[in-house]
């Protein structure tokens, strides 16, 4: 039941909807779109770092590590992770003289 399209009023027996066109296809479509929008917004807020990292850096896996020692692989992974982990809350102020 959408708060924007229906009005509830107390009656003798129970709460009753006074909206006569609630079965209108336009109202149904608007309700479905509203629910989908809410779900997508919640998912975006929950996973925004993962989503935007994927968009920014793509699905690239990096160069092949065949024949590379494990210590160098770990160092490469740490470099890649530190390049991705950017703290957006801090900005650098540069003053030119």
Curated annotation (Swiss-Prot):
It is found in: Virion membrane; Host apical cell membrane. It is a single-pass type III membrane protein. The record marks 37 as: Essential for channel activity, possibly by being protonated during channel activation, and by forming the channel gate and the selective filter. GO terms for molecular function: monoatomic ion channel activity; proton transmembrane transporter activity. Residues 1-22 are virion surface. The modification Phosphoserine is found at residues 64, 82. One of its GO terms (cellular component) is membrane. The record marks 41 as: Seems to be involved in pH gating. The keyword NAD does not apply. The chain crosses the membrane at residues 23-43. InterPro entries: Flu_M2. The M2 protein from most influenza A strains is inhibited by amantadine and rimantadine, resulting in viral uncoating incapacity. Emergence of amantadine-resistant variants is usually rapid. Gene3D superfamilies: 6.10.250.1640. It holds the Pfam family Flu_M2. Keywords: Disulfide bond, Host cell membrane, Host membrane, Host-virus interaction, Hydrogen ion transport, Inhibition of host autophagy by virus, Ion channel, Ion transport, Lipoprotein, Membrane, Palmitate, Phosphoprotein, Signal-anchor, Transmembrane, Transmembrane helix, Transport, Viral ion channel, Virion. Its main location: virion. GO terms for biological process: protein complex oligomerization; symbiont genome entry into host cell via pore formation in plasma membrane; symbiont-mediated suppression of host autophagy. Residues 62-83 are annotated as: Disordered. Belongs to the influenza viruses matrix protein M2 family. When the channel is activated, one or more imidazole moieties of His-37 probably become bi-protonated. HAMAP family: INFV_M2 (MF_04069). Homotetramer; composed of two disulfide-linked dimers held together by non-covalent interactions. May interact with matrix protein 1. Cytoplasmic tail plays an important role in virion assembly and morphogenesis. Forms a proton-selective ion channel that is necessary for the efficient release of the viral genome during virus entry. After attaching to the cell surface, the virion enters the cell by endocytosis. Acidification of the endosome triggers M2 ion channel activity. This is Matrix protein 2. It comes from Influenza A virus (strain A/Chicken/Shantou/4231/2003 H5N1 genotype V).
């Amino acid at each position: 039941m959408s708060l924007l399209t229906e009005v509830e009023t107390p009656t003798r027996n129970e709460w009753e909807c006074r909206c006569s066109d609630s079965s209108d296809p336009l109202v149904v479509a608007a309700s479905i779109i509203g629910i989908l929008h809410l779900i997508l917004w919640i998912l975006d807020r929950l996973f925004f770092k993962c989503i935007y990292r994927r968009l920014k850096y793509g699905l690239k896996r990096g160069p092949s590590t065949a024949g590379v020692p494990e210590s160098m692989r770990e160092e490469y992974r740490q470099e890649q992770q530190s390049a991705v982990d950017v703290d957006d809350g801090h900005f650098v102020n540069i003053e030119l003289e």
